[in-house]
Design a protein with these regions (language model features):
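Conserved catalytic core of nucleotide polymerization and phosphodiester-bond processing enzymes
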Residues: 1-190
Length: 190
């Protein structure tokens, strides 16, 4: 829904995780952006200013790079990362400049999953399919067979397969059509 309404997920997550920071920077409450239906957020007065502020935090001092932190939360959550691993990953990616507590890591990841509960549902569905069939398929139906023992260590790889393989297939189809058009300009455009 965010994508359809022109809102980057990283921006929205940063908004929700660090609302007090944005309120202090703007000198006004941002509660209306946090409580509005997603379809209305970008239409609210002042959204453009807030959106730019959140993105600009990527250029603030390392410990205040809230957009970066939110981006890391999104990626970690999408791959099913647990709080201890997320803490270490954030510390590594920030070159040792962003250190958060275990409680903060848990809160950040839980906030993301509260905002997007369908992600955990998709994770469960993916693991169930993997355990049952040993095969996952991308959105074009292309399979990936998992031949080793199915355990938690391979969940990240399983979660990554469908979206990454689907994008790879789309790219392949697009380049094939472009090459065909180059070689035969009379082929109608799709």
């Amino acid at each position: 829904s965010l994508f359809l309404h022109g809102i980057k997920s990283h921006v929205y997550v940063a908004l929700r995780l660090f609302a007090e920071v944005w309120a202090a920077e703007l000198g006004r409450s941002v509660d209306n952006y946090c409580t509005a239906p997603i379809a209305e957020v970008a239409t609210l007065r002042g959204w453009g200013e807030l959106d730019k502020l959140i993105k600009s935090s990527d250029n603030w001092s390392a410990e205040k790079r809230y957009y970066f932190i939110a981006k890391m939360v999104c990626h970690a959550s999408n791959y099913g990362m647990k709080p201890p691993t997320f803490r270490l990953n954030l510390l590594q990616k920030s070159e040792g400049k962003v250190s958060i507590s275990q409680a903060e890591a848990k809160n950040f990841l839980n906030t993301y999953h509260d905002l997007f509960p369908e992600i955990r549902g998709w994770h469960r569905e993916t693991v169930d399919t993997l355990r049952r069939d040993g095969v996952l398929r991308n959105l074009f139906g292309y399979p990936r067979v998992f031949t080793s023992i199915i355990d938690e260590s391979m969940h990240k790889e399983a979660f990554a397969f469908v979206p990454q393989s689907t994008v790879g297939t789309i790219t392949n189809i697009t380049f094939t059509k472009m090459q065909q058009k180059i070689e035969n300009p009379k082929i109608p455009a799709p």
